[in-house]
Design a protein with these regions (language model features):
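N-proximal short alpha-helices
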Residues: 24-31, 35, 185
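Catalytic core of Fe(II)/2-oxoglutarate
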Residues: 72-73, 82, 87-88, 98-100, ...
Length: 212
């Protein structure tokens, strides 16, 4: 049987108030907000900006741990391709199977992911031994995943985190924040690999884009 994904999402990206050369790219598209929820946009964008600050501080610590120059990563996020996603995984009413995923096994395509959960189990990560280990986190804790882009950018000194979400008989909420550098950032000098082009290539390999 094919893998089954079951979830509902709400996405938002950066709020750009200046004209720039990337403004018509999908990573910088204008956000669409529900007009019947007071203060929703304000609350979400405050959280979005806080996540950006946390992500930069993590990248600065990675620079130190790898003996990289100051701002090797951190100054490449002036106009980041950053996405905040609200996930809702409904509880399952039928017997679960091995292929019944909230999200099937994968690594994130981008640089850094902060994950906030409601404490409900479901997330698992793959250990170097290839064993899958459940991840538990309290509501006030942050799970950090490294993505494929950071693995390339760090010359494989940092490894991307394989993970999946198992379907459960409980509903589950999570908020991942995907933090990626500015579109034109070179993440591999040898291949002249551009961050935005790399992300677009990965998405095109995975998704079918349809206008309905």
């Amino acid at each position: 049987a094919s893998d089954v994904y079951k979830r509902q999402i709400f996405d938002c990206g950066p709020k750009i108030t200046i004209e720039h050369k990337f403004q018509y790219l999908p990573y910088y598209s204008k956000n669409i907000w529900p007009d019947k929820i007071p203060l929703f946009e304000k609350s979400i964008m405050e959280f979005y900006n806080l996540c950006s600050q946390i992500s930069i501080s993590i990248l600065k610590q990675i620079e130190i741990s790898l003996n990289y120059s100051t701002n090797f990563f951190a100054d490449k996020f002036n106009l980041p391709m950053a996405l905040l996603r609200c996930n809702y995984y409904p509880k399952r009413s039928k017997e679960l199977t091995d292929n019944d995923f909230g999200i099937a096994p994968h690594t994130d395509y981008g640089c850094l992911t902060l994950l906030f959960t409601d404490g409900t189990p479901g997330l698992e990560v793959e250990l170097p031994s290839k064993k899958w280990e459940p991840v538990t986190a309290k509501k006030n804790e942050i799970i950090i995943n490294f993505g494929d882009m950071l693995e390339i950018w760090s010359d494989q000194k940092i490894r991307a985190t394989p993970h999946k979400v198992i379907g459960t008989n409980k509903e589950r909420f999570s908020i991942p924040f995907f933090f990626n550098p500015q579109y034109d950032t070179i993440i591999c000098d040898e291949k002249n690999l551009v961050a935005g082009e790399y992300l677009s290539q990965r998405y095109d390999e995975t998704y079918v884009h349809k206008i309905i």
